[in-house]
Amino acid sequence: MLLNKARAYEYMDRNGLDALVAQMSINVYYLSDYWGSLNWPGFFDGTYFAILPRREDAPASLVIPSFAIRRLASEGGTWMPNVFSYSTPEEGATLDDDTPAGLDYEGWPLRPGVPLTAREQSWVDITRRLRDQMSADAVWAVVRALRAAGLEGKRLGCDDERTGAWLAGRGFDARCEYRRDVFNQVRLVKTPREV
C-alpha cells in the first residue's frame, strides 16, 4: 500500500477533516493503489476519485468509469472496500439510493462455452459484480461513495477546487475545502512501497 494511513489520519485530525477526497491522478493513486489508464495530469479531470474517511469503520471508496472495471481486476485491484462505477445516464432510472442510474455495463461479449483464462475469468467476475450498479456520471458515483461512508454534512479535504461545486450541483451537503496542502503533508513521509 502506498498510503501512510496513520499519517493521513493524523493530518485529518490536525485539520478537523472528516475525509480526504482525491481527484488529482497522483493522489487517487496514492490513496487507492490504482492507476487508471486515463489518469494523467491535466487530462480527463473528474474521471477517477478516491475517498478516504477519517473514521476507520467508514468504508474508503474508489470511483472509476465503467470501461476501467476490467483494468481494475488486471492491475490487482484496490485495498479500498467500495468501488463505485459510472456509465452513460439511463433516462429516468434510479438506483436503490435514489441517485440517477447509468446504463448497466456488460463488458465485452462472451461466447458461451469458450474456456477462459484466469485473467479473463477475473474480468467476467468483476463485471458481473459491478454491472448493475452504475451511476449516471462520476460525480453521482462520488455522492454515493460519500453517503456510504456517512460523510453528508461533514468537512471534506479536497485536492481540486472544483469538487465542492460539483457536489453542491448534485445537492450533496458537505463543507468542501481545497486542501492540497494536507495531501502534500501526508505524502512527505514515504512508505516503504513508495521508496
Where are these regions (language model features)?
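A composition/biophysics-driven feature that prefers long, compositionally simple stretches
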Residues: 1-195
